[in-house]
């Protein structure tokens, strides 16, 4: 809407000013200083630290994570998440333009994605307290694949775009709560920032590939059809990848409190 009304430069300036507010607001986010509690017992009745009582180092945690099959599967699945979100977020307006839809349809679609993302993320976090988080992740990825198939095979109209955007919005960042929770359950919270950051790094590599590959294939074929099918295949692959992931905390390997 800002671009349509004021052109791209004022719209970008408005977003930049909004981003500048993040810095001052962040100063209010302070953790209360408190004494670290004793190590809590793991599921196997031992303390979540090394057997000699020494907390595991960042290097040792990193080495263990990369030797952990379930952690690697989770990381691979998150690559797919980034691929899909970046492809749709960046290239959906161009795809709709190719179908002769008004630019406002694209902006409305992106707004709907943002709106329904709120509800989807909250729902995923709430459900994660009741059922297995890896099942939630598999469901999210599978539903993305189904939604994209329906979108590709139905006529592209403002209504179909709105329904697709709302559906994808509900599935957008709903992967975040269960993914971070699985990392914490598998490897503890002592080095969660680092280990969760590596999983998110995979997400960002997927984002790059989604944007770059879609542009390259569009230039080569004049269509986004190939990229849609790549995203669909990846969706079901990610759904399958997350099914065998085990969420158990590794025995006697983590200090639960930083």
Please name every model-derived segment.
Residues 1-6, 96-97, 127-128, 213-222:
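Interfacial helix-cap and linker-helix signal at transmembrane-aqueous boundaries
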Residues 1-35:
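Helix-loop-helix hairpin linking two adjacent transmembrane segments in secondary transporters
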Residues 18-22, 143-148, 168, 234-238:
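MFS 12-TM fold signature
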Residues 22-31, 230-258:
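Multi-pass alpha-helical transporter architecture, strongest
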Residues 30-60, 251-257:
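Flexible cytoplasmic inter-helical loops of multi-pass small-molecule transporters
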Residues 63-126:
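Extracytoplasmic gate region of multi-pass secondary transporters
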Residues 87, 105, 111-117, 121-182:
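C-terminal transmembrane helical hairpin of 12-TM major facilitator-type secondary transporters
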Residues 173, 186-221, 231:
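A late C-terminal transmembrane helix in Major Facilitator Superfamily
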């Amino acid at each position: 809407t800002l671009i349509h009304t004021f052109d791209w430069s004022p719209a970008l300036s408005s977003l930049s000013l909004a981003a500048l507010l993040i810095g001052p607001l962040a100063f209010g986010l302070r953790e209360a200083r408190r004494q670290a509690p004793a190590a809590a017992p793991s599921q196997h009745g031992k303390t979540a630290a090394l057997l000699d009582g020494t907390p595991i180092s960042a290097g040792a945690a990193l080495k263990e994570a990369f030797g952990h099959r379930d952690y690697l599967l989770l990381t691979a699945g998150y690559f797919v998440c980034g691929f899909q979100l970046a492809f749709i977020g960046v290239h959906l307006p161009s795809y709709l333009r190719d179908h002769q839809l008004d630019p406002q349809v694209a902006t409305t679609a992106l707004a709907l994605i943002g709106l329904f993302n709120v509800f989807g993320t909250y729902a995923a976090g709430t459900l994660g307290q009741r059922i297995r988080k890896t099942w939630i992740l598999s469901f999210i990825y599978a539903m993305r694949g189904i939604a994209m198939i329906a979108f590709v095979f139905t006529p592209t109209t403002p209504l179909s775009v709105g329904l697709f955007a709302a559906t994808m919005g509900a599935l957008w960042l709903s992967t975040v709560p269960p993914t971070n929770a699985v990392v914490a359950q598998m490897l503890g919270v002592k080095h969660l920032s680092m280990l969760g950051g590596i999983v998110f790094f995979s997400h960002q590599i997927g984002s790059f590939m989604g944007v770059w590959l879609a542009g390259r294939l569009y230039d080569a074929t004049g269509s986004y059809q190939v990229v849609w099918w790549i995203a669909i295949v990846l969706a079901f692959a990610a759904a399958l990848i997350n099914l065998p992931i085990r969420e158990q905390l590794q025995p006697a390997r983590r200090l639960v409190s930083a």
